[in-house]
């Protein structure tokens, strides 16, 4: 995992930008985390719950989310590119001026706004179904 933090100081304002690359997290609950203007690249998150997190103007590229939950998260001005979400759910999230491009959403529960975002730009929605057939003897 590579995490690089860049700091900018301008008069009384301080901002911290992170580049997160090849991070692999599993079976965690992440609460009230804020990333602003950061990049998350080629990382994997399995069974992670993101609760009350702010991803403001974050670029997600080549990231895999497997069995993750996003609740009350803010994705304003973020860009989701070439990512894969599998068995994920999104509850009460904010998507103002967010883009999603060439991203796969497989067996995910999407809120209505994210569902509309995925209708163009090369995104893919995939759903699997279990079918049980009874065979007469």
Regions found by a protein language model. Give the residues of each.
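Tandem repeat scaffolds
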Residues: 2-137
